[in-house]
Amino acid sequence: MRGMGDDGMGPMAMAPPRSGHATAAAPPPPQHKMAMMMHMTFFWSDRAVVLIRGWPGERGAGMYALCLLFVLALAALTEGLSVLSRRLARRGGGAASSDGGRPAPAPASSAALLTAVHAARMGMAYLVMLAVMSFNVGVLLAAVAGHALGFLLARSRVRPAARDGGGGVACEHGGLPPADGSKT
């Protein structure tokens, strides 16, 4: 006959004594699992792992340079797709309707193209973000340089200032509002 509180599970093991020192060392990790160190602070090395396990890794400075060029190009293309997205949005959805009222809705093909460009831009932006999360300073600098280069080529519209007679460079900020808030 079972007594009160007897659930049939047997006696419970006692908790280890509370003392200032450990009574047993932790067992070593299993040998079949590969230990992988992840940096949580920025570091400078050509032995980084960016986006894909083992890449560029221990493959040397040449592969690291290729990785940096890839991140730079990815960031620049992200800026280029941003401009393309704005142009498609202006072209597809800004036409006035025949009655002079609200703008006519964009055709479905225009909306689908705009959605595809947006999805590609966001995918590239997330890849750049994940690359920067490697905490490698070179990758961070490549991402910033890529965004700057993409902005310069796609959005700033830098061209020679021949028409104003000056020897400088005229710069129009296409798609960006003026800094003073005016509508010019």
Swiss-Prot record:
Family matches, as InterPro entries: Cop_transporter (IPR007274)
Keyword annotations: Copper, Copper transport, Ion transport, Membrane, Transmembrane, Transmembrane helix, Transport
Chain segments carrying region Disordered: 1-27
GO molecular function: copper ion transmembrane transporter activity
Presence of keyword NADP: no
Biased composition (Low complexity): 1-25
Protein location: Membrane
Organism superkingdom: Eukaryota
UniProt key word Chaperone: no
Membrane topology summary: Multi-pass membrane protein
Coiled-coil ranges per UniProt: none
Membrane-spanning residues: 64-84, 124-144
Family (UniProt): Belongs to the copper transporter (Ctr) (TC 1.A.56) family. SLC31A subfamily.
Main function: Involved in the transport of copper.
The protein, known as: Copper transporter 6
Originating organism: Oryza sativa subsp. japonica
Organism classification: Eukaryota, Viridiplantae, Streptophyta, Embryophyta, Tracheophyta
The encoding gene: COPT6
